[in-house]
Curated annotation (Swiss-Prot):
Protein name: Thioredoxin
Record keywords: Disulfide bond, Electron transport, Redox-active center, Transport
Family named by the database record: Belongs to the thioredoxin family.
Gene: trxA
Pfam families (alphabetical): Thioredoxin
InterPro entries in UniProt: Thioredoxin, Thioredoxin-like_sf, Thioredoxin_domain
GO molecular function: protein-disulfide reductase activity
PROSITE patterns in alphabetical order: THIOREDOXIN_2 (PS51352)
Keyword Disulfide bond listed: yes
Gene3D superfamilies: Glutaredoxin (3.40.30.10)
Native species: Buchnera aphidicola subsp. Acyrthosiphon pisum (strain APS)
Length: 108
C-alpha cells in the first residue's frame, strides 16, 4: 500500500526525476478548493495503483521553485512523469473515473 509522498523543492529531483517508476505529481495549495476535492481521490488512487504508479503532492506556496519549471499556471495540476520526463498533464479537479482513465491511457 503506497502512501502519498510529500514533495518539496529540495526532494523533487531525488523523488520524482530519479524515480524508475511512473510518478504522478499533484501541484496544489491549501487555499485551493478543487485541490481539497481531489485529495481523497488521490489517496484512493495511490492505494489502487500502488504497483503501477507513485503519487506525490507538492504545495506550490511552500515550494515556489518547482512549479514554474513545469509552467504550472493553475491548480490542481497533475503531471505524470516517467524517466524524468513529463508524459501527460491533467489540469483541474477530476473524478476518480477520469483519473483512472488518464492513468490507464498513459501507463499501460
Amino acid at each position: 500500500m503506497n502512501k502519498i509522498i510529500e514533495l518539496t523543492d529540495q526532494n523533487f529531483e531525488e523523488q520524482v526525476l530519479n524515480s524508475k517508476s511512473f510518478f504522478l505529481v499533484d501541484f496544489w495549495a491549501q487555499w485551493c478548493n478543487p485541490c481539497k476535492i481531489l485529495a481523497p481521490i488521490l489517496e484512493e488512487i495511490s492505494k489502487e495503483y500502488s504497483n503501477k504508479v507513485i503519487v506525490g503532492k507538492l504545495n506550490i506556496e511552500e515550494n515556489p521553485n518547482t512549479a514554474p519549471v513545469y509552467s504550472i499556471r493553475s491548480i490542481p495540476t497533475l503531471l505524470l512523469f516517467n524517466n524524468s520526463e513529463v508524459l501527460a498533464t491533467k489540469v483541474g479537479a477530476v473524478s476518480k473515473l477520469e483519473l483512472k482513465e488518464f492513468l490507464d491511457e498513459n501507463i499501460n
